[in-house]
């Protein structure tokens, strides 16, 4: 039983909640207390929560604070005992703020929920191209039962030793960014003086300088892979040994391109073994460097580039953007295995498109829409093969020194030329026939008669069939009635529709049960020398064919066009013959040698002379 003082003393709260939470509570005693003092406890709650005088309010708040502190200590004690009874050892004491923390499972669930929200947001922002997950949480496997498990802590990243960069052994002297080409060449000192030239940009001026100042000619200088390294090598050699002991001295004669410009010159060519070896070594080193750059691009997984035509972002590998340009926009850049420096290549094309310049014919247009229409209609869906700038983006141009891919293809074609040189036209005809046989079924283009179920391979034989079997000369009727192309379409569609509904298109009778009865009836109208009234069939609804495979419509138009061409040519020949006849007739009726001054005056002529002149 509980008692409460009438004064302002502390009143212990023995309500049902606190009794149940007490660790020493007896279930039976709790039940008796609940039954006997329920009404009194209810009054105590109402008294403590009801606004009254100041003393009652203070007493109620003081009572609640005391009960709360006791509840907290009781709960803590009960939790410790429970952990120890379940086998817990060395249970750590919790701080007062830990009572309000969530349980372990709720934390893991909230973490997973945040991870899912983060993943959903990033995946939507990635435009559908791969999922970008947040680095804050580790995603669990789908349908896993790891909700009660703690999230796995990330492993700390180990520090790395700073490794000194070794000497760069590349032809260009630098390691370019992935997707970009190195620069082969640069400022170069002359082989025999202190003047500098920027090679290979100033290679023509450098060649003139060598000829005029030093009487040196370098053969095929434009084919040297790296003129800078080439000149540096020979400048060091000439410092040890004079040029006349290495290269031959030549005096130009008539017919020589240098005749009259100089008395003699030293020719640096591949005829010297050292020169040939140097050129081949430079070419091989450039090929190795290009292949290394290509391998770096293949292994690069951080590739990201936007399409030059749309908003597609290619991520992960360069082949994605190449395949996208070919499959979606039909821009053929070639196979990814033959391409190198792809990022630089595509950025160069993007700059051209920003200037509204066609990538094939390199014409500039006023706006982008005009450029796109031009590239689509002209089928300019590749780069200009005659532009040497694009040679560095294709590995095939690095294989043979001094030969572009067009030259390599031409040599391959010449090697196989004798095998089919005499039968090109026959082979093309055979290939065309084979293509037609493989891709076109002969039954799909057969034309059906307008009066029966017979079919022919072409419209000309079908017209002969209708003319001989049914005595229906369609071409004659069309020419007699002077039907235009639309009227011819309406007529054929009208006949097809009437035959389909088993109605006579000649007399418009509708009493036939099937097409066979209609065919027998049409035989009674032989010969079909005239067409029905145009008001019956010359309507707009007959412009739409009733059958989708009625090839007689377009085949008939082709025959009529050919006849018009032949008729026009015949008319021109007849007009020329008629004109020549008129010219001859006018010449025969012309009196030659008569001058107006020789004619007598009319007043001097009598009636007999006038009659003779008339």
UniProtKB/Swiss-Prot annotation:
The record's listing under InterPro entries reads: ZN622/Rei1/Reh1_Znf-C2H2, ZNF277, Znf_C2H2_sf, Znf_C2H2_type
- Report biased composition (Basic and acidic residues) as residue ranges: 74-83
Task: List, as start-end ranges, the regions of compositional bias called Low complexity.
Answer: 54-69
Q: Where is this region: Disordered?
A: 1-160
Q: Where are the zinc fingers (C2H2-type)?
A: 356-380, 447-470
PANTHER family linked to this entry = ZINC FINGER PROTEIN 277 (PTHR13267:SF3)
Q: Which gene encodes it?
A: ztf-7
Instruction: Name the chain's protein.
Output: Zinc finger protein ztf-7
Q: Where is the composition biased (Polar residues)?
A: 18-41
Subcellular location per UniProt equals: Cytoplasm
Q: Where is the composition biased (Gly residues)?
A: 1-10
Q: What happens when the gene is disrupted?
A: RNAi-mediated knockdown suppresses lethality and sterility caused by let-7 mutant background.
Recorded GO molecular functions are: zinc ion binding
**Subunit structure comment from the entry:** Interacts with rps-2.
| GO cellular component terms listed in the entry, alphabetical order | cytoplasm
Q: Which Pfam families match?
A: zf-C2H2_2 (PF12756)
What does the similarity note say?
Answer: Belongs to the ZNF277 family.
- Give the species this sequence originates from: Caenorhabditis elegans
Q: Induced by what?
A: By microRNA let-7; probably by direct interaction.
Comp. bias regions, Acidic residues? 132-150
Q: Which domain of life is it from?
A: Eukaryota
Free-text function comment from the UniProt entry: Probable transcription factor. Limits the ability to tolerate cold environment or cold-warm stress. In complex with rps-2, mediates the cold-warm shock response by promoting translocation of components of the RNA exosome from the nucleolus to nucleoplasm.
